[in-house]
Amino acid sequence: MNPAFEEFDLDEREREVLKLLSSEQNAHFSFQGLRRRLGLHQETLTRTLKRLEEAHVIERSPEGYKLKGTGSIYSFAVQTNQSLAKPIIDAYLPSQVDVTVLFQKLRGRWFSNFRWLGYSHDGSQLSMSWISEDGRMQLQARISSGKITIGADSHTNQTESEQIAAAYQLFDHITKVAEEMVQVASPALVAN
C-alpha cells in the first residue's frame, strides 16, 4: 500500500468507484460497466482508476477491476447495504448445464441494449450483471444450487413493466445459451 495515500485523500469519484467495487464480495467490474454505472467520462474514470491502482487499493486483471486483497488496512466507509436487485424471474437450470461453462459463455457478452458490467462469486453463488447503455437500469443473474434468479435494479424511475421486460430479455439470452449447451451435451439420436 502507498503510505502517502490515506482514506481522507479520496475524492468523491474515488469513493464512488470503491463503493461499487465493494458492493459484492470478490466482484470484478469491466471498465465500460464502471463507466456506464457511475456516469463518468472515460478519461476521468481512467485517471481515477489509475490513482487507486497506484495506491494499491484496486487491481486490474483481464477480468476487470476489483478491490485488492481482503482485510485492507483501509476501512473505506463505502460498504453498502445495497439491496439486491428486485427479483423478477426464478427458474431452475437443466442439470446438464455446467455453471462454469455457462458463465464463460456469458461473461463479457452484450445483449439487446445491455452491456456487461461484471460478476462476483462467493463460493456458493455466482452473480453476473449487465447495465443498460444509458446506465439507467442494471440486470443481475444469480445462480446458486441449480437455480437462477434474475432481477432488475433501476437507477432512475423505470417502470416495473420496463424492468420485467428487460429481465425477460436477459432470461431469453441465458436460455438460448443453456439450450445450446444441453444440445451439445445430449445430441439427438440419428435414425438409420
Regions found by a protein language model. Give the residues of each.
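Charged, low-complexity intrinsically disordered regulatory/assembly segments
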Residues: 113-192
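Beta-strand residues in well-ordered beta-sheet regions across diverse protein folds
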Residues: 59-61, 68, 151
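Short amphipathic alpha-helical interface segments
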Residues: 11-27
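Short Lys/Arg-enriched alpha/beta "domain-start" segment
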Residues: 76-126
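Short amphipathic alpha-helical interaction segments
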Residues: 39-54
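Short, cationic-aromatic polyanion-contact patches
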Residues: 3-14, 30, 63-81
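A short, conserved structural fragment
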Residues: 53-63
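Short acidic, hydrophobic short linear motifs in intrinsically disordered regions
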Residues: 26-37
